[in-house]
From Swiss-Prot:
Name this polypeptide is given: Cytochrome c oxidase subunit 1
UniProt keyword Magnesium, yes or no: yes
Organism encoding this protein: Formosania lacustris (Oriental stream loach)
Pathway given in the UniProt record: Energy metabolism; oxidative phosphorylation
Residues that bind O2: 244
Keywords: Calcium, Copper, Electron transport, Heme, Iron, Magnesium, Membrane, Metal-binding, Mitochondrion, Mitochondrion inner membrane, Respiratory chain, Sodium, Translocase, Transmembrane, Transmembrane helix, Transport
Length: 516
């Protein structure tokens, strides 16, 4: 196995594997950072000794989990592996650009780690708001390195997005209409469009911040006629679509897993599912200022952003009820991926409900920057995106490797993880309602109980991560071959066996469309 196979690969399966391995590794780093946060907050008083270090850890935790764990795994890993197989394409539209998209990520990660190592690190929060991110509050190269890291990750995602859009539209067999492609393909396509439209705005915002810091421009400095609120608008115009970028591929995975383990040929309401994802993608761009209810916007502006945000709950509800309808009347197989998918549906819905609470601008004035917000987005990310990743991984692991995971251990892993994340994040709702603010390393002792509970939960989640590593080792050590796969006619990615040959669909796929 020559090293060139991995460095110079143009094979969508190899690049998908690279993304999965990189994402898993980054996930370990992000988990370690989150445990440092929970260790600091386990009891009142200082552990790390310095608020700047604490904020650097919080910032790095967010960036690592978002840009180097969730996105590479969901879009780069599952997307690269499955999209060509699902539409019958021999490879991605731009195979060498695909390779570059991946290899931009390790240098980007390196720059992010470097930013923590120089000066005092970037303790700005993942939003990197000026004036805290300006050259007075953050003198030195830390924030600049973080900005360059984001630029690289952004370029990687934009190139990947171009590739996925071109592939899904252009590389299908002529007889296959876009409305006959699987839902995961749709999810990745819509995600790619969101990336393509939102990332350039982030690039503009952080480039302006870079020049404010180094070239004496005043885009965000009132002294020169600038406005720090402009940065917030630019950042959140990217930042809100970004959270839908993180969850949409997860929606696609859950649709596949639920239909498969309910024994159904297709998910309930295919067209409704597609339109719901389109609606979520569109609405995601016109609600960004709900992150800014406390900056002093007009009451009519707040009213608009409140109602627009609530509208997103409608297509999201369409998806949740369609998943439940897919389950209805099916012969349910209680395999591990199904457990993850059911956990996803329940916990994502809980996270969505707290989101509806926060969409009310009047309530958000009180809850903004408290742990209620932290609890909300960790329910949709730590139990939405991560549960979707686990569902997809356990479901498609036999396809990726040709080996099967240990049934009992994966169920134990699910149980431990389920308890861990809920114990970690459910108490944070109480802390938020009691007024505990985010991004502080210490707190009044009235908040001790729920912080301690939360930190114990994080240790349980750590045990789950270690169990997962053991499960991976066990699967590769035992080498249990995959016997047979059911429902291959409606799950075309499995048609070539486990694992599929290095090159699939070298000759164009023959597609017959049955109208029934």
């Amino acid at each position: 196995m020559a090293i060139t196979r991995w460095f110079f690969s143009t094979n969508h399966k190899d690049i998908g594997t690279l993304y999965l391995v990189f994402g898993a590794w980054a996930g370990m780093v992000g988990t370690a950072l989150s445990l440092l946060i929970r260790a600091e907050l386990n009891q009142p008083g200082a552990l790390l000794g310095d608020d700047q270090i604490y904020n650097v850890i919080v910032t790095a935790h967010a960036f690592v989990m978002i840009f180097f764990m969730v996105m590479p795994i969901l879009i780069g890993g599952f997307g690269n592996w499955l999209v060509p197989l699902m539409i019958g394409a021999p490879h991605m539209a731009f195979p060498r650009m695909n390779n570059m998209s991946f290899w931009l990520l390790p240098p980007s990660f390196l720059l992010l780690l470097a930013s923590s190592g120089v000066e005092a690190g970037a303790g700005t929060g993942w939003t990197v708001y000026p004036p805290l991110a300006g050259n007075l509050a953050h003198a030195g190269a830390s924030v600049d390195l973080t900005i360059f890291s984001l630029h690289l990750a952004g370029v990687s995602s934009i190139l990947g997005a171009i590739n996925f859009i071109t592939t899904t539209i252009n590389m299908k067999p002529p007889a296959l209409s876009q409305y006959q492609t699987p839902l995961f393909v749709w999810a990745v396509l819509i995600t790619a469009v969101l990336l393509l439209l939102s990332l350039p705005v982030l690039a503009a915002g952080i480039t302006m911040l870079l020049t404010d810091r180094n070239l004496n421009t005043t885009f965000f400095d009132p002294a020169g006629g600038g406005d720090p609120i402009l940065y917030q608008h630019l950042f959140w115009f990217f930042g809100h679509p970004e959270v839908y970028i993180l969850i949409l591929p997860g929606f696609g995975i859950i649709s596949h897993v639920v239909a498969y383990y309910a024994g159904k040929k297709e998910p309930f309401g295919y067209m409704g599912m597609v339109w719901a994802m389109m609606a979520i993608g569109l609405l995601g761009f016109i609600v960004w200022a709900h992150h800014m209810f406390t900056v002093g916007m007009d009451v009519d502006t707040r009213a608009y952003f409140t109602s627009a945000t609530m509208i997103i709950a409608i297509p999201t509800g369409v998806k949740v009820f369609s998943w439940l309808a897919t389950l209805h009347g099916g012969t349910i197989k209680w395999d591990t991926p199904m457990l993850w998918a059911l956990g996803f549906i329940f916990l994502f819905t809980v996270g969505g409900l707290t989101g509806i609470v926060l969409s009310n601008s009047s309530l958000d004035i009180v809850l903004h920057d408290t742990y209620y917000v932290v609890a909300h987005f960790h329910y949709v990310l730590s139990m939405g995106a991560v549960f979707a990743i686990m569902a997809g991984f356990v479901h498609w692991f036999p396809l990726f490797t040709g080996f099967s995971l240990h049934d009992t251990w994966t169920k134990i892993h699910f149980g431990v993880m389920f308890i861990g994340v809920n114990l970690t994040f459910f108490p944070q709702h109480f802390l938020g309602l009691a007024g505990m603010p985010r991004r502080y390393s210490d707190y009044p002792d009235a908040y001790t109980l729920w912080n301690t509970v939360s930190s114990i939960g994080s240790l349980i989640s750590l045990v789950a991560v270690i169990i997962f590593l053991f499960i991976l080792w066990e699967a590769f050590a035992s080498k249990r071959q995959v016997m047979s796969v059911e429902l291959t006619m409606t799950n075309v990615e499995w048609l070539h066996g486990c694992p599929p040959p290095y090159h699939t669909f070298e000759e164009p796929a023959f597609v017959q469309v049955r109208s029934n």
